[in-house]
Amino acid sequence: MVHNDLIIGEGYHRKAGEPHAEVMAIRSVENHDLLKQSILYCSLEPCAHYGKTPPCCELISSHGIPHVVIGTGDPHSKVDGKGVAHLRSHGIIVEFAPSPKVYRQLNEVFWTNMTKNRPHFTLKWAENNTGHIDKNRTAAEKPLSISGSLAALRTHQLRASVDGILISSKTASLDSPSLTTRKWSGQSPTPIILLSQDFPLQKEWLSSLKVKPVLIGKVLPEGYPGITCDPRDLNQWVPKLLDLGLNHILVEGGARILQSFIDSDLADSIHKYISKDQLEEGVNAPEAPEFTTIAQLGNDRYERS
């Protein structure tokens, strides 16, 4: 909320079911009399329907806010221009920002959910300088430690920002990962495990998970929620994850799953860490498109697409 070029209020949408950003921005203004001479700037078109919260466009018009600047329209079928139409019908000036791509990136998870009817997938892996993500090993051997402490911290920060974390039962069997955000504040994501008869899950590991997992396979263990289908066919289960409230998913492995997401054009973003270590032979890292962001995290090279 801006009054005479001064910010008098601001807000953001914390999570589904809680008040939207417009509501929080209006609530944060101490003197509501100023709203009638203020401009509301929002990244997404104000909603126009009753869902988990009331319509934001009605709240805006009820406060007499005369001017609204919007980053981008809302692709949701229940909005899609209806919010703008309501505002203009109440005499409110509505403008759109000149660079909608910036605001779509800001709301990239929502845009993927709405326009592609599936979760937003972020892929993550670490590889050494020779392009391997692990050594060839048995279940009795520990996984190869590749990235350093800063990369690990960044990974846990990523985990805290997503709804689910996806791995294969092979990765679960070989590594027994905790899949938590123990190195970063925030709630741990829901583990999503793709089952394979060749790598049955250990009951001890399943019971050790902090969050009850979602299992995907032809036959599911009793007592665990999941999707019964062929996990190798992504089309059978990817859209169903939205129904479970899993809007943003971090895919951590293994290599075959990561490559399948890339090949299926499901890799919405990729985070890759490259160490200076070398390995003559091992498990090859996925082949990915060009990366646009390059930085240094301690001794590791960080690339992101």
Task: Annotate each predicted stretch with a short phrase.
Residues V2-Y103:
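Zn2+-dependent cytidine deaminase-like catalytic core
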Residues H13-A16, T72-H76, S99-P100, L195-F199, ...:
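Short, acidic/turn-prone active-site loops that include or flank metal/cofactor-
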Residues V79-D80, Q105-L106, L201-E204, G223-I227, ...:
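Short, charged, surface-exposed secondary-structure boundary motifs
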Residues E281-S305:
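Conserved histidine-centered catalytic loops in small-molecule metabolism enzymes
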Residues M1-D5, W125-A126, H132, E303:
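Short beta-strand scaffold segments in enzyme catalytic cores
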Residues S61, L242, I262-D263:
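Non-catalytic positions within long, well-ordered alpha-helices that form the structural scaffold/packing
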Residues T112, H120-H248, R256-Q259:
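Active-site ligand-binding patch in enzyme domains
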